[in-house]
Amino acid sequence: MKNVLRIVAGLFGAFFLISGLQWIIAPGSIAEQLGMPLLEGVGLSAQIGDMGSFFITVGVMTLIGVLTQTRHWFYAPSMLLLVAALYRTLSAVLYGAPFVMSAIIVEVVVGLFLIFAGPRIATED
């Protein structure tokens, strides 16, 4: 069971890491995949910086948790994902943004998975 959890967490980590790298390598492509336009000016800087750092952080911290088998590495990426889902929901409720159920489901499922898997993968604290 532990190795299955490590493999799944590793796949999630790799996915987020690759997505984060795409924000530097091909920002137009990853923006399109996420259903958003590539912004211009200061917006472009914020979009690449914020989105890239989000995905890189989730990916790298998850992979460090998988490789070191240390549970605390899974908590920050989980929090980032769950708060992103919360803010997506609030943006829809408060400001009329589209409710992107598919993204919210991914963020909640992966975020909760990391909370579940962390202690089961860990060999140390």
Explain the meaning of each model-derived region:
Residues M1-F15:
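Cytosolic juxtamembrane helix and N-cap/initiation of the first transmembrane helix
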Residues F16-S19, L80-L90:
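Aromatic-anchored segments of alpha-helical transmembrane domains
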Residues V110-D125:
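Membrane-water interface at the C-terminal end of transmembrane alpha helices
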Residues G43-I64, M79, V83:
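Core segments of alpha-helical transmembrane spans in multipass integral membrane proteins
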Residues T70-L80:
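Membrane-interfacial loop-to-transmembrane alpha-helix junctions, especially the N-terminal start
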